[in-house]
């Protein structure tokens, strides 16, 4: 229902316009207060790169963060990541991730980024606190903040926006009548706009999510996902249909697709109940970090990597590395 409202297919968005105007006024006032100097943002002693969205919902932001971390690591840059840790609840903040940190404590995306890249990761509702903690523990040259484009209390040197190339900005309205956290005109002020799927427009960086081999949660064995049979597909991400479409494009045709809420807590019994006798469960990598502790033999995940095309990605990386002292 919410997807139909935000796309404009359902006329119900009109009923939510008063709340959207209120959201827009408040969010605009907050940004303006920092722009005019009434409020002061905290500036870190190292460059900060924000990777965020203008819209709510899954746009492919986490794969972009992983891509950026790995590219900077390849250039010898010491990079760390901070996040709000949405979906997790730690005993105390800021929380520096370790191999023992769970998604219940830190949230699924920070744990995924930590496991995939090996980079230091810290979470806290107040991102400045996370930055201070991670810099106290590690000698880093640059910080990437996973989400937080609208978190103006933390000053930033580079802003990168990730856009869903198929859904774009829906009906163009602020939350809750539409998907917008800020108006599309905000794109004029960011350093780069990366478009996940669809058709990138002038000045935007095209990106595709490239699937790898399916990985068994228990053994780490790998195989072509099309070789798996009797598949039940599960996706607890911002836009589950994208994952199901990826499976189809890989030649894997699920018998059943189970969309879950983004950041949803997954109880072992609930996940186990999805799979019948002789069936194979295939999930996203973000779901896998929550399920690995209680995984069964026939559970697999399909990793995806961001593939950015054209000359602009290299120019963006050169711009970012030029800030490193």
Swiss-Prot record:
Known pathway: Glycolipid biosynthesis; lipid IV(A) biosynthesis; lipid IV(A) from (3R)-3-hydroxytetradecanoyl-[acyl-carrier-protein] and UDP-N-acetyl-alpha-D-glucosamine: step 6/6
Superkingdom of this protein's organism: Bacteria
Binding site for ATP: 55-62
Enzyme class name: transferase
Tagged with keyword Ligase: no
One function term, GO molecular function aspect: ATP binding
Gene Ontology annotations for the cellular component aspect, listed alphabetically: plasma membrane
Catalytic activities: a lipid A disaccharide + ATP = a lipid IVA + ADP + H(+)
Role summary: Transfers the gamma-phosphate of ATP to the 4'-position of a tetraacyldisaccharide 1-phosphate intermediate (termed DS-1-P) to form tetraacyldisaccharide 1,4'-bis-phosphate (lipid IVA).
Protein name per UniProt: Tetraacyldisaccharide 4'-kinase
Organism (species): Salmonella enteritidis PT4 (strain P125109)
Gene assigned in the entry: lpxK
């Amino acid at each position: 229902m919410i997807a139909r409202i935000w796309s404009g297919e359902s006329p119900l968005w009109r009923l939510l316009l008063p709340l959207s105007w209120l959201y827009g006024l408040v969010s605009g006032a907050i940004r303006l207060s920092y722009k005019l100097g009434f409020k002061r943002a905290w500036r870190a002693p190292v460059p900060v790169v924000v990777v965020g969205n203008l819209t709510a919902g899954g746009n492919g932001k986490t794969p972009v963060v992983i891509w950026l971390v790995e590219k900077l690591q390849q250039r010898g840059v010491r990079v760390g990541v901070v996040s709000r840790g949405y979906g997790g609840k730690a005993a105390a903040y800021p929380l520096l991730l370790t191999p023992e940190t769970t998604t219940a404590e830190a949230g699924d995306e920070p744990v995924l980024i930590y496991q995939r890249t090996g980079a230091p990761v810290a979470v806290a509702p107040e991102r400045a606190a996370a930055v201070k903690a991670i810099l106290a523990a590690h000698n880093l040259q640059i910080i990437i903040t996973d989400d937080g484009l609208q978190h103006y209390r933390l000053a930033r040197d580079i802003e990168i926006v990730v856009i869903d190339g198929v859904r774009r900005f829906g009906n163009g309205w602020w939350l809750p009548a539409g998907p917008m956290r800020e108006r599309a005109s905000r794109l004029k002020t960011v350093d780069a706009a990366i478009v996940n799927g669809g058709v990138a427009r002038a000045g935007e960086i095209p990106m595709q999510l490239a699937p790898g081999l399916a990985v068994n949660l228990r053994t780490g064995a790998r195989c072509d996902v099309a070789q798996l049979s009797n598949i039940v597909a599960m996706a607890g991400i911002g836009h589950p249909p994208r994952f199901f479409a990826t499976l189809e494009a890989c030649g894997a045709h699920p018998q059943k697709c189970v969309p879950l809420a983004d950041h949803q807590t997954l109880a072992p019994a609930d996940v186990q109940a999805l799979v019948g006798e002789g069936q194979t469960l295939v999930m996203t990598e973000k779901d896998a970090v929550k399920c690995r502790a209680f995984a069964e033999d026939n559970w697999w995940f399909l990793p995806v990597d961001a593939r950015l095309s054209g000359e602009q990605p290299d120019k963006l990386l050169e711009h970012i590395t030029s800030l490193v002292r």
